[in-house]
Regions:
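Walker A/P-loop nucleotide-binding motif
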Residues: 108-128
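Structural motif
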Residues: 172-174, 206
Length: 270
């Protein structure tokens, strides 16, 4: 729509918006300014359009930042689907995970982390991923990784301290599957350095592991014991039990495959 179609001139000589009826011009006080008697001003429509434009660019900047941080956080794109929206929120541990996010500022201020432990396949990584994705939406920097990846990344580096400091710099660090990595003296040394530096940074840490909590607490091997002691110093243990979700998913896929394959004539799948 052309501007002349939305503007009219009032009896006072000022331009008015035909839509909202508010003046689009105003008189300078007294003698004017540099020979001009009036100046432009925003009407209600102009102000609304400006606010919408500002919101658009602010939202665009926000989601671009979230997208960048998300790509840094996860090594696999499928983890971006690990969200509370896709979770069973009637689950007690999942509810606690959501509460952790809802109280993030207090958790961060008090350096409170979590240790999700329990049998294989019960959804510990998924829970940690839900926390990560929800915080990422609020522009919190998160890194979710595991020690096998960390050790492989660090091994060829001349300056290992820089890498470890980078892990410590994220507002939240999530270490997935503690205990599946190599148990060499070198590996345990790297693990301790990462955990120790993280704790000294004062920033929260979340760990997932298949190791039983009593095994973690009663570890006698010195190199492992000092790692576990540091973790328990910061992370609140939460048991994640129940049936294996991986087995349930595999069973569901098997039944789906049988249904699809048996639609064709011939020998049925067993």
């Amino acid at each position: 729509m052309r501007e002349e179609d939305t503007v009219c001139v009032g009896s006072d000589g000022l331009q008015y918006c035909k839509v909202c009826g508010e003046a689009k011009e105003a008189f300078f006080p007294k003698c004017g300014f540099m020979g001009m008697k009036k100046h432009s001003r925003q009407c209600v429509c102009d102000r609304k359009a400006y606010e919408e434009e500002q919101k658009y660019f602010k939202d665009k900047e926000h989601w671009e930042l979230v997208s960048r941080n998300t790509s840094i956080c996860f090594d696999e794109s499928r983890m971006e689907e690990w969200t509370f929206e896709n979770a069973d929120m009637s689950d007690a541990v999942m509810h606690k995970a959501k509460s952790y996010v809802d109280n993030w500022e207090e958790m961060k201020r008090n350096h409170i982390g979590c240790l999700f432990w329990g049998p294989v396949g019960t959804g510990k990584s998924f829970i940690a991923g839900c926390i990560a994705n929800e915080l990422l939406k609020h522009e919190v920097t998160v890194k979710m990784t595991n020690f096998n990846t960390t050790i492989d990344d660090i091994f060829p580096l001349a300056d290992k301290t820089e890498y470890i400091n980078a892990l410590a710099s994220y507002q939240l660090l999530i270490i997935d599957d503690l205990g599946v990595e190599r148990n060499s003296e070198y590996a345990l040394g790297i693990i301790f350095s990462v955990i120790d530096r993280r704790i000294r940074s004062g920033r929260p840490l979340i760990i997932t592991t298949n190791l039983p909590l009593n095994e973690i607490k009663s570890e006698t091997v010195l190199d492992k014991k000092r790692i576990y002691d540091r973790i328990l110093e910061m992370c609140t243990p939460m048991y994640v039990g129940g049936a294996s979700k991986r087995e349930a998913i595999a069973s569901m896929k098997m039944e789906k495959a049988k249904t699809l394959l048996n639609t064709n004539k011939g020998e049925e799948c067993e």
